[in-house]
Amino acid sequence: MNDDLAIAQATKLKPIDEIAEFAGIERKYLKPYGNYIAKVSHRIYEELAQREDGNLILVTAITPTSAGEGKTTTSIGLSMALNRLGKKSFVTLREPSIGPVMGIKGGAAGGGYSQVLPMEDINLHFTGDIHAVSLAHNLLSAAIDAHLKFDNELEIDSTQIYWPRAMDMNDRALRKIVVGLGGKANGYPREDKFIITAASEIMAILCLAKDLEDLKERVGNIVIAKNKKKEYVLAKDLKVHGAIAALLKDAIDPNLVQTIEGTPAFIHGGPFANIAHGTNSIIATKIALKLSDYVVTEAGFGADLGGEKFLNFVSQVAGFKPSVVVLVASLRALKLHGGAKKDSITEENLEALEKGFVNLQVHYENLRKFGVPVLTALNVFPTDTDSEKKLFEKLCEKHGIPFGESRVWAKGGKGGEALAREVIKLAETHTSEYHPLYLMDTPIEEKLDILTREIYRAKGYELSPTAKAKLRSFKKNGFGNAPVIVAKTQYSISDNPKLLGAPKDYIFNIRDLNLSAGAGFVVAVSGDIMLMPGLGKEFGAQRIDIDKSGKISGLF
């Protein structure tokens, strides 16, 4: 079989006008970027608002291997399969961050015969949204240092500045820096750092805002520092929130592209799921729901990260009511959770598979707590043996877990038809009784207790002295009931990446709490979470090339 890029480049794309017409998007709302990409004005929602929503299908996964479980590929393939079965569908996904594309992860536009296209553009720059977020973020950084240099009327404490700088590249040398060197003309020296743009609060805001006015208000509410009286200083105190919103005036519009089979796709926004809420923009999904029978959307990493955040936080903010949750699993990941060595998970190992199945069980049970029908999708790999697949089926039947096989990587939409039929059956015969595990105004301590016990299966949690002090400050300043986004490892249900399978009855440690007042949540940090990745000894950029005709190679 050809590699992903060869398959993508061999596909004859439809003009974006045709994709928009099929989706029901009028030409007046389109801003084309070449022949195969277009921005869709977010204002189209005003015209569509009175229509009924289609069915929202959330795709999440078990605790993944470092290679991922294939959520994006499954999401794309499922949307194509639904279209093949006569259901008008849309897929809504996050935009890839260039840093990981150039690093170890590679591209993030699906794979095999289940891709969104044009994949080279999607993976490299796209419509410039991430660059716009970087500029907006760094305008605020520059404004802070300008204010410090010229009189500092807000009395900002230079040792209590929370706002870093941002760049969409993996660069470990920028994790800790000193700015303002070179004399008084360059400002005052202080410690600073860079984070990757996907980790910026502005990226989270872009994906949560309902319109430009809401976006501007949220940006204005970003807490950038404390002053010398220990009071919060906000972005609007520097009077740059209007300019930041202006920089994002096009970025707020969803990007329309197509799947390999011509299914409409929105690719918009890219917050990470282990440090933010981990799903594409609310605007894109809300528009798609008005245009389709079925919208397939993905939440990053496992069900304990992106899945939990979508169901507890994003759905409450947006007013979503998911119809079905699809839980993607692979035999190789289950074998890893059952004790198989990382370099041998492609080999048959029935004992490890049976032992590791408990990871799937826990995620399935957790998702059912939200009142939404859950379907497991077995992402089939060529190395899966018949004996392993039979054992998986037997275990699912034993524990009452409905499942369907996904072969979309190898067969495109046709390989997802069995899964799509099960999704349709669940959506049309089961009423979703969706409910979050906590309400928005629940105190932070109660939210943490619910999450650590119900999702992470801990017996409780413990706050570090730093986290306790910050919680007191949040309460004092009116943020004691803020929604909670837990930043933790993606490789375990717990806070320890080495605890595979289904750990339980441990203490979940929270070392820090960070306020994202503009986005509207508090981030509870557990363990070592990296906000600026680094390139490895060997990395993706070393494989990427371009010839004299402009044809790109090496992307995957």
From Swiss-Prot:
What pathway does the annotation place this protein in? One-carbon metabolism; tetrahydrofolate interconversion
| PROSITE patterns in alphabetical order | FTHFS_1, FTHFS_2
The GO terms this record gives for MF are: ATP binding; formate-tetrahydrofolate ligase activity
Keywords in alphabetical order = ATP-binding, Ligase, Nucleotide-binding, One-carbon metabolism
Q: Does the keyword Ligase apply?
A: yes
The positions annotated for binding ATP are T65, S66, A67, G68, E69, G70, K71, T72
Pfam families in the record: FTHFS
* Annotated InterPro entries: Formate_THF_ligase, Formate_THF_ligase_CS, P-loop_NTPase
Chemical reaction(s) catalysed: (6S)-5,6,7,8-tetrahydrofolate + formate + ATP = (6R)-10-formyltetrahydrofolate + ADP + phosphate
Q: Which NCBIfam families match?
A: PRK13505.1
- This chain's protein is named Formate--tetrahydrofolate ligase
Name its species: Kosmotoga olearia (strain ATCC BAA-1733 / DSM 21960 / TBF 19.5.1)
Task: State the encoding gene.
Answer: fhs
